[in-house]
């Protein structure tokens, strides 16, 4: 008579025949069975068989379950046996999940990052901090759950064995990877972060701050990097607004010093609004749009030609200097913010990239020059800023050759990159980029993601082959070195195995696409 049983964890417990009978009956019920007596009979025969084989030796749980399967099959209960085997497998899998997860939790809780691979797997997260550890708790639990409950067994097995690597498995059912954020469109009428609405910015410092907020906010909706495809064009709008404001302020200052006009600020505001309403003109960095002539005509009613020339020269000089300084400070703030502001549970900074290089306007050039100078200067103690990753676009006729309008910026980019690793360079004239480029359409200029991939082709609709507002679903890598090693020089086998894994990954990514395609808009505020 069996008195004790050895549990999987080594504990010794009293043997209970009813537990075996109940498990068999549940399996029978799952396939339509209703005979509890049959379940009891199988349990008794199992015990008798064990005693016959092993005598008084105490059984393990696994040994009893093996004999239950054998007895069910021999007694002609094939369907119940199949259900019992499935039930046993699911229980085993649940135990494995719990066991693996507990080991991971133990490592995260008690080991430091220097001793834990799990805590170090993302260089952008400090695994020793409270929020870093908390993030890893959630990430580790999600990975275990998805591997055991969501992924198809063949996909999970290939990932677990290292034949493929499903990137960001912890976000499998939650969100997409990365996005090219179109700041021009975003800033036109303001935008919401999900927690409040932000008005359209009206100064380069506001443009810089809201760019960081947009990147940070979107980072909380995605698991990959965030990129701005048109940083120079987008920030140029902020420089334009800043110059206009500073120019009019300096005209008012000069009027106050050199004339007897009362309320000079109100006077300047009034005639500037009239000029804009009548002609659409505003002060601009290039001073080539006719605004100064229109302004001189308005001022001539109160001032002499010499006074007007002096005031305008003073305003231009100081407005340029102040705007340039404000732009440098805005770019400096952007770099410092993107290396210090937190996202994702407060555990990491946004993985950010900015693309620039093609804007030849004075405003765009001022942005590019100052973001590179701020990068070259480094962070507070001179450290090299890791973010944003910067990509400088190079093109003949724009920046590649001496005499090109942005050639000086190209040289500055090379100098900055030599010291600070960034910017990287993308070549618009490269054949695989040039075929998409349409002059006069900045949206067709190649841009790279926060994750350093490029998305511009569009098989579904070739008329929409653009960069802004595009993104990636996700990635899965294939372990090519392993295939090569296993091939042992057999090229044919290598390509057969590669094709098999390509098809496997294709199916896995389509499954992930189907999952994410069912998400609701409200889940991405």
Language model features: what each stretch is:
Residues 1-108:
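Charged, amphipathic alpha-helical regulatory modules used
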Residues 90-94, 100-525:
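Conserved catalytic cores of very large enzyme subunits
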């Amino acid at each position: 008579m069996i008195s004790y049983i050895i549990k999987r964890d080594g504990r010794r417990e009293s043997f209970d025949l009813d537990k075996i009978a109940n498990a068999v009956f549940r399996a029978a019920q799952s396939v339509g069975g209703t005979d509890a007596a049959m379940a009891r009979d199988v349990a008794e025969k199992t015990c008798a068989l064990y005693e016959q084989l092993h005598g008084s030796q105490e059984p393990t749980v696994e040994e009893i379950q093996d004999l239950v399967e054998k007895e069910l099959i021999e007694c002609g209960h094939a369907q119940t046996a199949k259900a019992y085997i499935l039930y046993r497998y699911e229980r085993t899998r649940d135990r494995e999940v719990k066991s693996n997860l507990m080991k991971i939790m133990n490592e995260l809780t008690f080991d430091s990052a220097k001793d834990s691979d799990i805590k170090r797997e993302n260089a952008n997260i400090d695994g020793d901090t409270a929020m870093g550890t908390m993030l890893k708790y959630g990430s580790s639990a999600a990975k275990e759950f998805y591997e055991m409950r969501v992924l198809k067994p063949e996909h999970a097995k290939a990932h677990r064995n290292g034949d493929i690597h499903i990137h960001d498995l912890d976000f499998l059912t939650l969100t997409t990877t990365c996005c090219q954020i179109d700041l021009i469109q975003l800033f036109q009428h303001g935008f919401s972060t999900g927690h409040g609405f932000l008005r359209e910015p009206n100064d380069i410092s506001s443009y810089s701050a809201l760019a960081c907020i947009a990147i940070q906010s979107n980072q909380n909706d995605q698991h990959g990097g965030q990129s701005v495809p048109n940083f120079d064009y987008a920030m140029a709008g902020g420089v334009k607004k800043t110059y206009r404001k500073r120019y009019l302020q300096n005209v008012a200052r000069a009027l106050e010093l050199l004339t007897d006009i009362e309320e000079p600020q109100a006077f300047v505001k009034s005639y500037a609004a009239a000029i804009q309403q009548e002609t659409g003109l505003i002060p601009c960095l290039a001073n080539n749009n006719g605004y100064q002539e229109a302004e001189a005509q308005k001022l001539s009613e109160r001032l002499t030609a010499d006074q007007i020339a002096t005031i305008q020269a003073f305003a231009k000089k100081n407005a340029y200097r102040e705007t340039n300084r404000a732009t440098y400070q805005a770019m400096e703030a952007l770099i410092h913010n993107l290396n210090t502001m937190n996202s994702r549970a407060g555990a990491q900074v946004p993985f950010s990239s900015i693309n620039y290089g093609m804007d030849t306007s004075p405003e765009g050039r001022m942005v590019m020059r100052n973001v590179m100078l701020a990068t070259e200067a480094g962070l507070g103690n001179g450290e090299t800023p890791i973010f944003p990753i910067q990509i400088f676009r190079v093109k003949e006729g724009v920046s590649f050759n001496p005499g090109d309008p942005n050639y000086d910026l190209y040289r500055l980019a090379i100098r900055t990159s030599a010291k600070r690793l960034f910017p990287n360079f993308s070549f618009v004239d490269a054949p695989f980029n040039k075929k998409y480029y349409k002059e006069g359409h900045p949206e067709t200029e190649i841009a790279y993601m926060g994750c350093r991939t490029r998305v511009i082709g569009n098989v579904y609709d070739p008329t929409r082959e653009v960069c802004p507002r595009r993104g990636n679903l996700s990635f899965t890598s294939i372990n090519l070195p392993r295939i090569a090693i296993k091939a042992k020089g057999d090229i044919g086998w290598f390509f057969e195995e590669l094709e098999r894994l390509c098809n496997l990954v294709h199916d896995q990514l389509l499954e992930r696409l189907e999952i994410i395609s069912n998400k609701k808009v409200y889940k991405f505020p």
